[in-house]
Structures are given as C-alpha cells and as structure tokens.
C-alpha cells in the first residue's frame, strides 16, 4: 500500500474548486435538471440490494473527481493487497484477512508462505460438527440433560457483531436460546444467569487473547456460578467452550483443548463474526444458515474486488462520506434501519467505523491535516422519527443518512409493512426536498391570517442528503452481503484518508490506567493530594467515603 496524503493529490485540489461550485447547490434543483437522476445514481447488487444515492449533493462530475482521488490514492492496489494477505496492518505487522474466512472457493491465500485456507476449513468443519451435536441434542450437560441455553461472554468484536447478527436473523432461530454478556458491570451477568440453570447452560468464552479484563472477569463469575451447583471441575468440559488464539490462557482457565475453537491474529476483533467468534450465530440459526451468511459476504467481496469504481457500491459510498466530511464539514452520519430485527445494526457499525477510522495519525506517522472518521450513530424504525428526526429536518447540523429497509417482511401483519415503507419513502423525500414557505402561504392566509406568525416554524429547508438502501429481505445471505458492503466502505475511506483502519491503539491507555486504579480502589486508605490529579483523587476518595 502506498502512503499518500490525499490533500497533496491533484484530485483533492480539483475537488476543492468543485466544492465552491457545489456548496450552494440544492438537491431539488438537481432533480429538476435531470428527470432520470435516479437511474444515473443508483446501483443494484445481485438483484437483492438496491443503492439509491441520487438524493446527495453530487453530480456526475463530483463522482468522477472522487473516483480520480481514489485512483490517485492507489485504492485498487490496496484492495488487492488486503485480499492476497499482505500485512497492511503495519503497526501490528499483520495481514487483514477476514475476507478469507468467507472464501469458499478453496483458492490458496498465503501468509509467510503458508496457505491459511486449510486452517479455516478445519475450524469451520469443527464448528459444523459441534453445532450438529448440540442442536440435535447429542451434546448433553453434566446431568445428561440437553443444552437449551447458550451464553456468549465477550466484548467489542467478540460480542456486538455476533449479537447483532443473532438478533437480525432471529426469524431463523431454532430451539436454542442465545444470550450475550459483555459489560463488566455485575448487573449484566446477574440479570441473565438468574433465569438460567447450570445443568442446561453452555458458555462460549469469546476472547482472542483470553486476557480481556471484562471477558475474563465475567468468565470466572460464570465458572463460579456453574461450580456452585456442579461441584466438580471435571464437568466444565460439558459447559464451557473457548473461542481464542491463546491456548495457554484457555488451559489455565480450565477449558479442555478439544473445547477450543481457534482464531488467528490476522482476524481483527471487529471483523471476526465470520470466524469461530460467530459460533453463537451458527448455534442460533444452524450452521447451514451461517454458511449462507458467509456466502453473501463473499459475493460482496467479489463485487468490491472486481467491479469498476463507477459501479462499485462500497467505493461510491465511502467516497461520498469523504466528500461530506472533508468538504462540507458534515461531522456525523447516521444509519437508520427500518426493520425491528436489525435494531443493533447501527450500533455495530458505530463500533466498526469509529474504531477503524477514528485516527489522527496517518500511515506515515504524521498528524493529519484533514478529517478522518465521521461520528456514526443511528436508530431503527419509526421509533427514531419520534426521537431525533426533528434535528435532522430543522436543526443546524446536517446529518447525511443511510436509510435501510427490507421489501419483504418476515411478519406481514395486516398493512404494517406498507405503512413502514411509506414512512421510509416519506422521510427521505422530506429530508431531500423539504417544505418551503410558498406551499404554506395560501393555506395560512385562507383560514386565519394570524397563523402567519407560525409560518417560519413550519418551513423545512430540505437539502439533507440521504442514501436509500433497499434489501429484498433480511435473510442470512443478504445480511452477509450488507455487512460486507459496509466493511469495504470503511476500508475505502481508510485507504483514501491514508490511515490504518485495522489497529486501535487509542483504547489501550484507558485499559492500562484502569488496572492501576483497580488496585487502589481495593484499599481503604484515602489518597493524598500527590497521588494523582486533583479530579481523579477527589473522585476516588468520594468513592471510598460513600461505599461505606
């Protein structure tokens, strides 16, 4: 990968000039000038996902210049470097190969001269056999009863990705009940375990390093809870599974080697749901459906790898985000999913996006002089309309949005889904085109001239950019494609912005400080003024006074 400061490229300077012509442009005017704008600015993927990006403050010239920027930043070679296993995560000297996890074509991919595909297939086969045994009732708990409850203990990528997918595909779930524990707050694990029985509960301890404080703390609490009932450690083998790359630490915990599903350091945590970290998904919906999830992601991988930039969905979406963040100074973007099953989707990609591209140091080790990752947030369904859409329609902050909705509902109750779709289409139309005073004058004067006073409050300026993403239905294959689409969008942004999207050094300091502070919190002694800064001292001392 080449390390190119995007602001030093010819394309960036051309985009700056182009922005001066575009900053006053209105989306409504763009549609009036081009009656076929939808056709010009929409892409259909495999007849399952439609991306309509026509309601953006862009022209064909904008897209042309953004694509030229991507080419100047050597995006094509960066994509090839990732897929073929080059160590593009240079700060950790690691390859980035979550794409290999869904490569079902048996095409060799090598790291340091070793083909990794056989290792992947071996773990997938082990997952398949385990899922079959447990779902069919052949894997029993220590009392001989069938396992009916699965508790995944992890955090970050070991939790939110599998949790999101399990919720999104709940329509496909079998008889197993899957729960997720992540927070180190004791309330989280307590509220889940209080309804479960040790005799039919299986724990998945999901931690690549098997040293993550939150996960290991919760894992030991789960172990204590289990042994309080089972009494003998020999029974752990029927109730504890490890998803990890640290075999030694897993053994220290007391989990048998045969109960370990292996992970590798070329799989980043936030991209790991495709690996053994997705065992909770496979147990919930069955391994065949998990394979369909992988196949859907693979299809999007091939689109990203092979389609020209002009028709490449992740690239187009990534470049439009850069356009808004760096030229319009729109600091946030939102994902709004009109599907109840998908209620965690925006939270998951908040993590993937902000942990990947929330960087201020470029790949050359220099402080950047431009914007990198956007603040990403979101919501789901019409609930969000009654929460924060007011700001999006009439506030002073412009928030580019992705609206996502399935065409086919799994629960077609009466006319609910048509009303949901009507709201979806209405919101993107209202955000783009608004409601001007001319439309209100006649109505207000006709009935009561005094009401003219409220006229300014009823104006919606419009010109709020959105992408409309229609997905035929939420099924494992389609969801896999959608997730991979966003993964590659984030990668595109990282390459063009010259940052490493696959490390997360910013989270380390807080972890280190918390370990030191934990030992202090266990002591009764009040801190003196020289121990830490006055704020930290004061907070700790109040804790010690009040906990009594």
UniProtKB/Swiss-Prot annotation:
Checking InterPro entries in the record gives: G6P_Isomerase, G6P_Isomerase_C, Phosphoglucose_isomerase_CS, SIS_dom_sf, SIS_PGI_1, SIS_PGI_2
Gene Ontology terms describing biological process: gluconeogenesis; glucose 6-phosphate metabolic process; glycolytic process
Q: Which UniProt keywords apply?
A: Cytoplasm, Gluconeogenesis, Glycolysis, Isomerase
Gene Ontology cellular component terms for the protein in this record: cytosol
So where's the catalytic machinery, residue-wise? 355 (proton donor), 386, 511
Q: What is its EC number?
A: 5.3.1.9
Under which name does UniProt file this protein? Answer: Glucose-6-phosphate isomerase
What organism is listed for this UniProt entry? Answer: Wigglesworthia glossinidia brevipalpis
